[in-house]
């Protein structure tokens, strides 16, 4: 991800996420042409990149149906307009690749318990193989949390995604009892049932790739507070979702609570999530869709205040949904571009106890007529993950302050060479190494004076590869 430097101070580490919804083609894809779908996604990600968004939660399992080839479940109807039809490409792989090109994390959003209408392909396929696994509530099918194999099935599904794809996270949605479910067990037993499912998924993905984050989107209010009531709709009691307990137990790396509220329905419950985060990541979901006149017609000030408080509290932010954000509803995109004046890295997974990578051993800078050409090498990973990432910093002050987000010009970069347009300036550079857990090495610095002393390289030589 290449970005321009700005003067506004923003945190160096902060989750800035969006939910990219595929069900019913709400955010993407908007057409059934594979070519147009790819162009649409590129346009969306370019917009997100310009607003310094660093995490995309893409809905990959929709309703027992997928946007990628799977032996377990059929293609979702959103891809071609026909359920089960192959669109001719792997949309999840394409999204991962395009996110990584832009220095963004890509998390596979997995809708867990709901499996769609009773007679849809995905629901029927599971019922045919496992007749006791799906329960009908009204016209909808749901995986039964009280069947032990539900956790096994979902763990197998998430393991398959983790093994086959370079996802940065598995994001569980609806990991709870449905609100329409007639609970026949105690609330405590219901919570144990859901927690058992989470444990199985956690074990499965960490056995494959321990750096892959496991997260979920819990109901926005965990439970009643001493001074503020949840109005009967909360995670812990209403739907048996002990999300704070999952952080405490260490079987969840991050939470994205669906905090689609304002005022006293928002701020006290934000404080509660922070107080019980146990050192893990929390990035509350904000209801940017509520800004739309056909929804609640909120004023932009509601979202603006919430974003300011979340930043002051050291929490991340997640937007629901992507289209309302990129459509600049009530100016939310414009505000966010200014608010996120500098890029940010994802907070490191320090609880995994991994030793950070060794820094690069060499950093060379050559100067052409238009760009500084950086090359580096010699870094070493200590985490056992599959590859390293690099962050590049630039400043007119030496040494470059790598703790200042304003100096970060390229984040989560896979290569070991970069051309930086210098526009006639003499800049100092620093490169750090980052492992898949987000641990960052010490910086290798290069002085601008060294650049000025080098022979100027004709840009025409660069074009012909000399």
Features from the language model and the residues they span:
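Catalytic domains of carbohydrate-active enzymes, especially glycoside hydrolases
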Residues: 39-66, 164-169
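Aromatic-lined carbohydrate-binding/catalytic grooves of carbohydrate-active enzymes
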Residues: 51-87
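Aromatic- and acidic-residue-enriched segments that line the glycan-binding/catalytic groove
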Residues: 66-81, 114-138, 175, 180-188, ...
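Aromatic-lined carbohydrate-recognition surfaces of secreted/lumenal glycan-active proteins
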Residues: 100, 105-117, 171, 190-236, ...
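Beta-strand-rich modules
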Residues: 419-441
